[in-house]
Design a protein with these regions (language model features):
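Catalytic and substrate-binding clefts that recognize carbohydrates or anionic sugar/phosphate headgroups
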Residues: 1-151, 158-161
Length: 163
C-alpha cells in the first residue's frame, strides 16, 4: 500500500497488498520496474491494442472514449491494471488505482518493464503461481466474478430507420 489509496471496491475478500519489500519489482519514486530477460513475455492489461504479448509498447491505463482504435494508440476505453510476467520468473501484479497508470513494456528500454503511477495513492498486489493460468485464477479470486458481457457486441447492428 502506498500513500492513501482510494477504495475502488475492486478487491473482494481480505487480501493484503504488498508493502515496502516487493518481490520481483524494484521500487522507484513514481512506481516500479522489472529487469526482463529476452525470453520474458508480458500478458494482461485487458482488452487493449496490439498482440497478446504486450512487450515492446507503451500502454496507458486510463479510461478514454476514443472511437479510433488503431495500432499507434496507447490506451482504449478500459483500465485493467493487471499484468503477468512469464519467463525467468512467473508472477502477476495488480495495481488498484483509479487514475492514470503507464506501462512501458520494454519500449524505452527493451529489457525493462517500467510502471508509472500518476499519484502515490494505490495498492499493489503481487500474485505468485505455478503458471500464468494459475495466476489468472488467483487474480479472479482477488477481484471477484466477472461481470456480465456487454450486449452491444452480441446483437446485429441496424442502420438508422431500418425495420
Amino acid at each position: 500500500q502506498y500513500g492513501h489509496p482510494f477504495d475502488t471496491e475492486s478487491v473482494v475478500g481480505s487480501f493484503v497488498p504488498a508493502m515496502e519489500t516487493i518481490p520481483y519489482l524494484t521500487r522507484e519514486p513514481d512506481g516500479f520496474s522489472y529487469a526482463m530477460d529476452p525470453q520474458d513475455i508480458l500478458y494482461g492489461l485487458g482488452e487493449n491494442i496490439r498482440g497478446i504479448n504486450k512487450r515492446g509498447w507503451v500502454y496507458e491505463s486510463k479510461c478514454s472514449d476514443d472511437p479510433n482504435h488503431t495500432e499507434n494508440k496507447s490506451s482504449l476505453y478500459g483500465a485493467y491494471n493487471f499484468m503477468i510476467v512469464s519467463g525467468k520468473a512467473t508472477f502477476g501484479f495488480f495495481i488498484d488505482y483509479p487514475g492514470k497508470v503507464t506501462f512501458d513494456c520494454g519500449y524505452t528500454d527493451l529489457d525493462t518493464l517500467r510502471v508509472t503511477v500518476a499519484e502515490e495513492n494505490y495498492d499493489l498486489y503481487i500474485i505468485e503461481g505455478e503458471s500464468p493460468t494459475d495466476i489468472v485464477h488467483q487474480f479472479r479470486q482477488l477481484v471477484g466474478a466477472a461481470t456480465s458481457r456487454p450486449k452491444g457486441p452480441l446483437v446485429l447492428p441496424r442502420a438508422a430507420g431500418a425495420s
